[in-house]
Amino acid sequence: MFNIDEFKEIAEKLPTFKSLPNEGKYRTAIGRYYYCIFLKLREIVKEIEQDREDGIYELLNSGKAHKALPAYFRTLSDKIRVDNLKNDLITLAEALEDLRKLRNMCDYDVDVSISFTKVIEAEIDIEIIEQTITNLSYQKPKSKTKIVGLKNVLEYFKDKDNLPTYNEVINIMYRRR
């Protein structure tokens, strides 16, 4: 199985290669940062969703996955009443959306100049997301038990049958903001 962190390693090292053209290496580094974190998040959610039969797993394996993943976290945040968890899920979705916009600009907008500053923006987004994956937590109601880590929190809500449904995610994906 491919080690997704290799994308991050490439993204970190690529801008330091003096023999390569600056803008090309900056654009490529940003793309590798995006795919590193997108694939990490997608694999976490797919593992949780693999035995549910409402279509989320299939959605995450489709071309719509890039919109579906942040919508999944936004949908889950809408279901939660705990402010810190709700805010962390929104932050996760927003950072992923920001990183995707930056990656799309790098891949498709050839008239825009991409500087090293944009690579730093991507690094900040990936750091926010990685910290959230690790530190996201949920305090069970009327309990001293604290659930820590994105995967563990998703498993808890899966056990409570409170994960986003396919229709909820689709609605978030296509609603106007």
UniProtKB/Swiss-Prot annotation:
Protein name as it appears in the record: Uncharacterized protein MJ0992
Record family assignment: To M.jannaschii MJ0628.
Domain of life assignment: Archaea
